[in-house]
């Protein structure tokens, strides 16, 4: 079986969805920009030699519809002979895109693929066109379709206080801002054209979603966003709405070596698991455990974790049940997470994997695990190993 390696991993800056940097930039353009950039950074690979393009996107309608992956590849002027498909596993879409490409390579059906994902939450709102089947209420709680309420339920089940949530959210912004100031994101962010507050076209090379002024004291004044009476989850402890894309060049190890390309990481194992939709945010726990089992590892073997911060109330129970509460500052989301950077739904799986690989290189780590929850009760995880 072929070994799967990540040759390169990049992303756009994360733009605010409400009047942000990419308010006049389409999702296909963000995607095409990264496709072109990956190929430009790796000229040893002939674009015509790509076997497929797997691109995650959740809301596949409006500008994100009609197979966005193919539209973006055509905009990027990738040869017409290279196919492309848009993948949807809700929040896990771009990590699923990685898994799909990895399996193709493992079985010998492909040697080189572009993978990634995008979500323009400013142009295609999260609730656009959503209409759940009424019959689902027979076996799934209505609140299962309301992500904030699932986070509330999870926090109550696991004893996660408002104070714990506020502290974690403040940490996310502080870590992300420190990473920005130190240049830690420089190797993963590709400068991307957008418009500033005055409408002037400029190149953005930083995440505009981060709020460096965030404090626990300020967060403590916010009202609950989803359960106004007894709730603890606020807008400040939820992932920010943002627009962005992320991409990876994935190859068989043999093809990468043949082309003289240096692999940055190897895909050690992959897993997807279902869980109760009412506590959908718990999905990373069983998914991570299964991925670790497949890799022949335990949580203690993992040097660094990237866990998508859908909500502080969601990620803290996962950290707790993976036995990592005492290692947050040493191992988990060292450059902040989605609370600070935002969670462009179809982009986030590739984004956290990209950030993880860069962190692994910076910290000289051997093993890393990226994982995320998925709406309606799923979790997805990938174990990476430095080559």
From Swiss-Prot:
Family: Belongs to the thiolase-like superfamily. Thiolase family.
A single Gene Ontology CC term: cytoplasm
Entry keyword set: Acyltransferase, Cytoplasm, Fatty acid metabolism, Lipid degradation, Lipid metabolism, Transferase
Keyword Membrane annotated: no
Catalytic activity: an acyl-CoA + acetyl-CoA = a 3-oxoacyl-CoA + CoA
Chief place where the protein resides: cytoplasm
Known function: Catalyzes the final step of fatty acid oxidation in which acetyl-CoA is released and the CoA ester of a fatty acid two carbons shorter is formed.
Metabolic or biological pathway: Lipid metabolism; fatty acid beta-oxidation
Catalytic site positions: 91, 343, 373
Biological source species: Enterobacter cloacae
Pfam families: Thiolase_C (PF02803), Thiolase_N (PF00108)
EC number: 2.3.1.16
Biological processes per GO annotation: fatty acid beta-oxidation; phenylacetate catabolic process
Name of protein: 3-ketoacyl-CoA thiolase
Subunit-level organization: Heterotetramer of two alpha chains (FadB) and two beta chains (FadA).
Gene3D superfamilies per record: 3.40.47.10
Subcellular location: Cytoplasm
GO molecular function: acetyl-CoA C-acyltransferase activity
